[in-house]
Amino acid sequence: MSFNLADTIRTARLQLLADAMSGGTLTLYTAPRPAIGAAITTQTALVEVAIPAGLTASAATLTLSLATSTVLVEDEAVWGRITSSTDEFVADGDCGLLASSAIFKLKTTYLAAGANLIPIIASFSEP
C-alpha cells in the first residue's frame, strides 16, 4: 500500500510539531530511555537547551540548530526529550554523532561537565 500527501499537507503537519516545541526545551539524558512521554526516573539530565520561539517548517522539513549550552553533568548522552514552553511532553529522540541517523546529532555523545556543548542539530521531515 502506498499513500502520498501533498507537500503543503506534509509541511503543515511539521508546522504542528514546530508550534509545539517553539519556546520549549531540549534536555539530553543518560540511559535508559523511558516509554514515550513517561516520567523521568533514574535518568540523569546532562544539559538543557532552549528552543527558540517562532519555528517554521518549510518544504516538509523542520531543522533546529540550537545555541551553545553548558553541560551540567558528565556522562553519555543517549536520548533527548523536547518539552513545550509550558513544560508539556512533545517528543523523545535518540542522540548520535553528526554522521549518524539519530534525531539529535552531536560532535560527541560523551559530555563533560562545565564544557560548552557546541550547537545541536536536529532535523525532522515528512516522507
Residue ranges and their predicted role:
Residues 1-78, 84-127:
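Small cysteine-rich, disulfide-bonded extracellular modules of the LU/uPAR three-finger superfamily
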